[in-house]
């Protein structure tokens, strides 16, 4: 049986969850349509998603049509959940990008399309909600051409009045874009020779799969218009990106989830081989795990299975698998462009409203952060406050609601602040010697640190001979330094510096790698005190797309948010502004843009780097480490 994995992507409220329900219903996977409004859909399966009416986590379901099984990934539709979208993109064979006939191409649509093209995922445009009043499809087509891609082919004829219907396009005009994109076909056409339907279809298929042509289909998911045709298109157009001829196993974890019974579930896309129950499988070419229980989606329901084939999505109950873990041979993973998940840029303090719920809160945060790598937390050693870091304010709001509604923990939360970094100011050296108080460890370590240009990252080298200090001790020093770099003098990550391990001494047989591992961060702190550090704040590069009439306002407002516009382009009555802005200002700038353009602007951002800040440094509390904090305290007293 052919297995394909498709993604359903769209801006908020474009109808992607409703479309998924219609695909399941029309294929016979379910006997009754679910409703977003009634909370009975198969993919928005958490209480929070049903209450808010938006998809927050990746939902997975499936249907079978003739000899093809289709796994549907119903991805989130809000900007703060793009990390979840990007993780799901890596396992797709193709995508359906929904566009509301009423709303046209929205900001989120453009962001999602940018990601799909970057990762090389064949994409179909599906214009949804064609049954709404006041629809002008020619305007929607023009919107797609100007904001997404001009390389589209309209595959259907739509009759809106008096009786709405969608039929396959038979006119020759549908092939114009296909012909114009191929020199041989264009020359043949211009010379008056006839073009066979087969060669046009083959050229369309080639360009569709290399992401240079995008078919356009139409319908109404809510009223079941155009859905049967879409099912035929899905099963015939998309290919499975699997190694059918390979017997070696290869799969990748793309989602971690906790069930209502607190079972830890790992979602895996298989790219090669067959996975059997009770198999022992190597993870990321390291340790092995035994497959004791395995599930997959069959006609919209999770079912236990004994084996799974290449192309399938399987769910394992496992405590050790992590996001992006690879089962089996890593060399068999598809070579796709990787879109890096953005770093958390904000943090805040969160505490339970009822002190007796503190342990419940910590347990809940452990589960949530395990599922979402953009959400991190730690407990301050001095104040015992719980510090939460995240990407955006909507992610923060959803996390708070999740804590209350799923874990039944009421919380109090402070206004979030930006996450900074530190860089040494000058070169410095420091050594802590063995058996010299207050050093309790059987180790001597000497380190030097020197600043590097912004954006260099942390570089480490050892000038201590392996012939003198063996690899296990050397590795322990490096691990201790990496741990120490997580907290500089002001409590932030240390970056853009070179750290050299210059001196080491051990006593045989009492010295152990643990002595070096625990002493290294203490030496690092002392050498940073000699060097001093400066604070760096995150800057984002941005690209703003807005109607041309808002150019003056966008320029006028930029200085208010410390934004620096470095390039301006005009295209199709649209202005494209490029520049950079402090991360602490982006939320307000983006909100302002949305407001004065009436939602017609797009602001794409990514981390550009860190700039030196001015003014009073912002401090962050240190995280606890009971094994070295007392020693740190003693050294700080004498230095």
Swiss-Prot record:
NCBIfam families: small_GTP (TIGR00231), tet_protect (NF012153), tet_protect_M (NF012155), tet_protect_M_W (NF033148). It comes from Streptococcus pneumoniae. One of its GO terms (molecular function) is GTPase activity. Signal peptide: none annotated. Keywords: Antibiotic resistance, GTP-binding, Nucleotide-binding, Protein biosynthesis, Transposable element. SUPFAM superfamilies: EF-G C-terminal domain-like, P-loop containing nucleoside triphosphate hydrolases, Ribosomal protein S5 domain 2-like, Translation proteins. The keyword Nucleotide-binding applies. This is Tetracycline resistance protein TetM from transposon Tn5251. SMART domains: EFG_IV (SM00889). Gene3D superfamilies: 3.30.230.10, 3.30.70.240, Elongation Factor G (Translational Gtpase), domain 3 (3.30.70.870), P-loop containing nucleotide triphosphate hydrolases (3.40.50.300), Translation factors (2.40.30.10).
């Amino acid at each position: 049986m052919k297995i394909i994995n498709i993604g359903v992507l769209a801006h908020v409220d474009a109808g992607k969850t409703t479309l998924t329900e219609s695909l399941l219903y029309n294929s016979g996977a379910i006997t009754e349509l679910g409703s977003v409004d009634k909370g009975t859909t198969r993919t928005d399966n958490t209480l929070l998603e049903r209450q808010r009416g938006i998809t927050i986590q990746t939902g997975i379901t499936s249907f079978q049509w003739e000899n093809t099984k289709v796994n549907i990934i119903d991805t989130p539709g809000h900007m703060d959940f793009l990390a979840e979208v990007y993780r799901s993109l890596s396992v797709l064979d193709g995508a359906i990008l929904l566009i509301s006939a009423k709303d046209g191409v929205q900001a989120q649509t453009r962001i999602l399309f940018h990601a799909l093209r970057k990762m090389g995922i064949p994409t179909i445009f599906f214009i949804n909600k064609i049954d709404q009043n006041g629809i002008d499809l020619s305007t929607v087509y023009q919107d797609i051409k100007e904001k997404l891609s001009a390389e589209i082919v309209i595959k259907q004829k739509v009759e809106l009045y008096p009786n709405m219907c969608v039929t396959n396009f038979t006119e020759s005009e549908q092939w114009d874009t296909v012909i114009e994109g191929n020199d041989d076909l264009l020359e043949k056409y211009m010379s008056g020779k006839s073009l066979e339907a087969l060669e046009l279809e083959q050229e369309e298929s080639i360009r569709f799969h290399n992401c240079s042509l995008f078919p356009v289909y139409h319908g109404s998911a809510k009223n079941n218009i155009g859905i049967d045709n879409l099912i035929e298109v899905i099963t015939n157009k998309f290919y499975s990106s699997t190694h059918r001829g390979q017997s070696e196993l290869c799969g990748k974890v793309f989602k971690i989830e906790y069930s209502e019974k607190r079972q830890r579930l790992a979602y895996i896309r298989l790219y090669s081989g067959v996975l059997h129950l009770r198999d022992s499988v190597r993870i990321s070419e390291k340790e092995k795990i035994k497959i004791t229980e395995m599930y997959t989606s069959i006609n919209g329901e999770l079912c236990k299975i004994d084996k799974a084939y290449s192309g399938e999505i399987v769910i394992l109950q496992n405590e050790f698998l992590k996001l992006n873990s690879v089962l089996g041979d890593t060399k068999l993973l598809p070579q796709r462009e990787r879109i890096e998940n953005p770093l958390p840029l904000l943090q805040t303090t969160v505490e339970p409203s009822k002190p007796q719920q503190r342990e419940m809160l910590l347990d809940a945060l452990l589960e949530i952060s395990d599922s979402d790598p953009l959400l991190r937390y730690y407990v301050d050693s001095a104040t015992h406050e719980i510090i939460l870091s995240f990407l955006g304010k909507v992610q923060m709001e959803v996390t708070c609601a999740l804590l209350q509604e799923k874990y039944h923990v009421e919380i109090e939360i402070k206004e979030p602040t930006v996450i900074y970094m530190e860089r040494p100011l000058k070169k410095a050296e420091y050594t802590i010697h063995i058996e010299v108080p207050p050093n309790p460890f059987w180790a001597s370590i000497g380190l030097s640190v020197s600043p590097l240009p912004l954006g260099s990252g942390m570089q480490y080298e050892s000038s201590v001979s392996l012939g003198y200090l063996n690899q296990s001790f050397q590795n322990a020093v490096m691990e201790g330094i990496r741990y120490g770099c997580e907290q500089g003098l002001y409590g932030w990550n240390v970056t853009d510096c070179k750290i050299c391990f210059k001196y080491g001494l051990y006593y045989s047989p009492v010295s152990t790698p643990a002595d070096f591992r625990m002493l290294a961060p203490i030496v690092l702190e002392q050498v940073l005190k000699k060097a001093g550090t400066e604070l760096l704040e995150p800057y984002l590069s941005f690209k703003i797309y807005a109607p041309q009439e808002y150019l003056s306002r966008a320029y006028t407002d930029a200085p208010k948010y410390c934004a620096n516009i470095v390039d301006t382009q005009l295209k199709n009555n649209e202005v494209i502004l490029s520049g950079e802005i402090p991360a602490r200002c982006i939320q307000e700038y983006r909100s302002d843009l949305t407001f004065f353009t009436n939602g017609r602007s797009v602001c794409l951002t990514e981390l550009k780097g860190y700039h030196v800040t001015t003014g009073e440094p912002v401090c962050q509390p240190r995280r606890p480490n009971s094994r070295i904090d007392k020693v740190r305290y003693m050294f700080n007293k004498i230095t």
